[in-house]
Amino acid sequence: MTGQLVQYGRHRQRRSYARISEVLELPNLIEIQTSSYQWFLDEGLREMFQDISPIEDFTGNLSLEFIDYSLGEPKYPVEESKERDVTYSAPLRVKVRLINKETGEVKDQDVFMGDFPIMTDTGTFIINGAERVIVSQLVRSPSVYFSGKVDKNGKKGFTATVIPNRGAWLEYETDAKDVVYVRIDRTRKLPVTVLLRALGFGSDQEILDLIGENEYLRNTLDKDNTENSDKALLEIYERLRPGEPPTVENAKSLLDSRFFDPKRYDLANVGRYKINKKLHIKNRLFNQRLAETLVDPETGEILAEKGQILDRRTLDKVLPYLENGIGFRKLYPNGGVVEDEVTLQSIKIFAPTDQEGEQVINVIGNAYIEEEIKNITPADIISSISYFFNLLHGVGDTDDIDHLGNRRLRSVGELLQNQFRIGLSRMERVVRERMSIQDTNTITPQQLINIRPVIASIKEFFGSSQLSQFMDQTNPLAELTHKRRLSALGPGGLTRERAGMEVRDVHYSHYGRMCPIETPEGPNIGLINSLSSYAKVNRFGFIETPYRRVDPETGKVTGRIDYLTADEEDNYVVAQANARLDDEGAFIDDSIVARFRGENTVVSRNRVDYMDVSPKQVVSAATACIPFLENDDSNRALMGANMQRQAVPLMQPEAPFVGTGMEYVSGKDSGAAVICKHPGIVERVEAKNVWVRRYEEVDGQKVKGNLDKYSLLKFVRSNQGTCYNQRPIVSVGDEVVKGEILADGPSMELGELALGRNVMVGFMTWDGYNYEDAIIMSERLVKDDVYTSIHIEEYESEARDTKLGPEEITRDIPNVGEDALRNLDDRGIIRIGAEVKDGDLLVGKVTPKGVTELTAEERLLHAIFGEKAREVRDTSLRVPHGGGGIIHDVKVFNREDGDELPPGVNQLVRVYIVQKRKISEGDKMAGRHGNKGVISKILPEEDMPYLPDGTPIDIMLNPLGVPSRMNIGQVLELHMGMAARYLGIHIASPVFDGAREEDVWETLEEAGMSRDAKTVLYDGRTGEPFDNRVSVGIMYMIKLAHMVDDKLHARSTGPYSLVTQQPLGGKAQFGGQRFGEMEVWALEAYGAAYTLQEILTVKSDDVVGRVKTYEAIVKGDNVPEPGVPESFKVLIKELQSLGMDVKILSGDEEEIEMRDLEDEEDAKQADGLALSGDEEPEETASADVERDVVTKE
């Protein structure tokens, strides 16, 4: 026997074929959500309040400070919030201090700042009763970026951009004449020296001394028309504020507020970190030849001679001195924006581009600025300009914008913080205004603060942001993947149309950080990604992945694990996880395949710095659930990963025989299972609850503690209408530990993810029924409910106040027989357990009709019976087409009972209908390797091919689906599954480290099967064996959420479009089938004139003709002549509206009037006979318009 047994949870053992031992446990998979939100509550909010306080009025004698904040308890628990359609939130209270500096009076007060949505334990938010997920966003990190460009004449140049978190952009570029320009905030370009003069380096000589003599700077100075700081300031002011009279003072304050005001310009922590890293002098000194001697200023020791090359060793020796002041220069700008001294660090080197090697260039760094300074400084601007000139001389590197070192994640916490900042800044404006209006002596903090803008901005974010999404709850894996999704779209991100090929492509820095496989097919490919299984996000928002440290002295792999970001990893050589190690942790082979900056190289073992943690650190959680992934083509693996998320939870789930070992972790972390929070002993187990008695260890003794009650969800409707049901998997007396699974969620079995079923599959054709990937299935799977799923649909009806009086929910409905009311209770609401079909009543409701001028008889009736005789119309809730089933639950909310309802609604009734859907022809199924198909035929069991022992197989797949798709994983799974079934075991074959071909053969032989795993099959119809032996085995097949019941649709008559009078389209509108231009050609080609005529007239938009035809069919008469289509009349009206005089002439040149085209009688009839299902809103709308016109006259 190969492989070793591994325990997954309490109930499942799998034989694992992994050769590489796990050195690191998988992290909690939804940590990206929970930890980010926790940061927001602990620090993010505090940062916001510190940024905004104190708010001072215009005179400066009132000041408002935010001291502290606290969150209260949520009003309703999670489940109740969902039921009541409210937001799961807690009240935010802030302690505010108002100081009056004139009188010295201090007022403290607690102010309520609105209800704040709280994250549930599973990483979701409940907003208005719906479960939502905030997706993390991938954006460009604030920093300074340099990139090369080639103009149309083939001349090389450079561009640079300083991108802040918020504030004005600064861009540098070269032109064809080697002049360097700057753009401030996307305005017209100026020579870069204008900006330097405006900063306070007014003369040409000052600029040359600062940057260093070079031809590019000379060209730029020649182009620059300003001679001093004042003129430069005026020039910049004219660009930024065209049309306003420029003055030097205005220009100074404008430039100062644009760049040096922390409220206007923010780099954030990450921007300061990136800029300090990029503009540090050491990166540009590596491997360069010094043009000056470096001396330790304290001891006078010579560290490096002039002309010496700074290799890695020399640079490491010089580095500590660089930090401590070698090359520091203090500059005193005057006459410009900057009034304080500026500290820079500069060192002279020889230009590598100069052939003679005599040209000296100046390398300027920003002398490391503290992390607290979040705005840009003059030193940053000068260093970035210096870097740009250095690039022109071949010193420094350009940046790769798609590298994950330059892209960062904004998770929930930061997105919320940005939104909260918008609300607070709006509130700040209001506070200032109120300070100046109200009486300063009697004022309180509560009167100053208006919390509306804060609440509005939070509501707007959760309700309508592109990143706040309705959770995909089809199954636990879909839920988990949605929480780990990374999107490059959204506010401040990319748009689908503008995103090019490069952004979407797989980049080497994605390794271990973003999954190269899981991404949608279609317009979003590459823009929406998934976090890799081991990845974490650091405090700057960069994605880190873990590596095992290799000790540089001994060359052994240590137990220490370092999390590296993409740009840190670029400095190291990393070995693969499958590099062979001895027992000591030393590499066995002399030369090792390793990665360095995206290149795969073979290096000697003493050059390796790190080693991968696990082979599956490359891929995401969903991709890691595909066994034999390494044998699949990546395009098909992508489909496999995506289709697992569409698996419908089955009535009887079953974990795969051939898994990867990820099933347990995915199921546990998804949030669908019930997890034990404290160790203890199970005391009682029911369908809806599990009770666990806690115990604590005290002096080595187990002491009983409290009793914890865990409630289970039973038959709840998920966001996607699938059935969400939890069932206990522990028994009374079990000892449970913290983190253990107490109850399975949907699509789980014994704690493992179970998306489908293990079925016996044969690769063979059968009378052409599996042409084009179609699937042939045995009727056994229908009879035994193997692929039966439960679906719950929610319908609601609300009784509102209308202009004509309130609507009423009642059993007393006009023109409805007693038979239709048999299942309604005395309130007019359907009873639980009733079976309903399409069109049945669910909730009886009547709406008052518009009162017209009454006749004498009606007035008499009114006088006798009072209001009873008021006309009402039936607006009851009925079962829509295809929505029949059994009433599972009814919920009634009444305004009188104190339920919170939207304004104008008096009563709300929700009806839940449950359907049990067996698998049927037309349903879509798939394996885990992208092998998808539609069921074309369900054969009786006796007609299916059978094995020599008489067992009929369950499913037949087309063998032609394998070779061209190159997903051989399915064949290996098939063989392994068959062996596992014979041996009665479950198997774990982890990705990139699973069972090899030899393992499969050995396992087959162990199970007593032939090595090729082929069998003789007999035809179920004749009993004859088929000509060739067939591959038969167990494959894990899932039923996808694309079910034929949801797509089936038919219409006889229904709603019509208002202008063209043609039927609407689509199932949702109960529309017709489109008969387009090409279909018309087809009928013309056949010469089917009458068919064509009725399709274009009575079946579409001949208003009178279709009514007559309907009547004729009902009465059994002959169908009348078609009339003129409505769209023809619309066409004429359109031409007339363009000012053309269009007339219709008969055959004898007589003009025909539009209204002559239909008889007066027919028109009346058409009005009288309203077809069933006509769109009511449209009728009433037109009627209202007419009525308005009459009253105005």
Curated annotation (Swiss-Prot):
Key word Ubl conjugation present: no
EC number of this enzyme: 2.7.7.6
Basic and acidic residues composition bias: residue spans: 1184-1193
Top EC class of this enzyme: transferase
Catalytic activity: RNA(n) + a ribonucleoside 5'-triphosphate = RNA(n+1) + diphosphate
Record-level GO cellular component terms: DNA-directed RNA polymerase complex
GO molecular function annotations of the record: DNA binding; DNA-directed RNA polymerase activity; ribonucleoside binding
KW Lipoprotein (keyword) present: no
Keywords (A to Z) from UniProt: Antibiotic resistance, DNA-directed RNA polymerase, Nucleotidyltransferase, Transcription, Transferase
A Gene Ontology biological process term: response to antibiotic
Residue span of region Disordered: 1149-1193
Biased composition (Acidic residues): 1149-1162
Record-stated family: Belongs to the RNA polymerase beta chain family.
Subunit structure: RNAP is composed of a core of 2 alpha, a beta and a beta' subunit. The core is associated with a delta subunit, and at least one of epsilon or omega. When a sigma factor is associated with the core the holoenzyme is formed, which can initiate transcription.
Stated role: DNA-dependent RNA polymerase catalyzes the transcription of DNA into RNA using the four ribonucleoside triphosphates as substrates.
Identification of the protein by name: DNA-directed RNA polymerase subunit beta
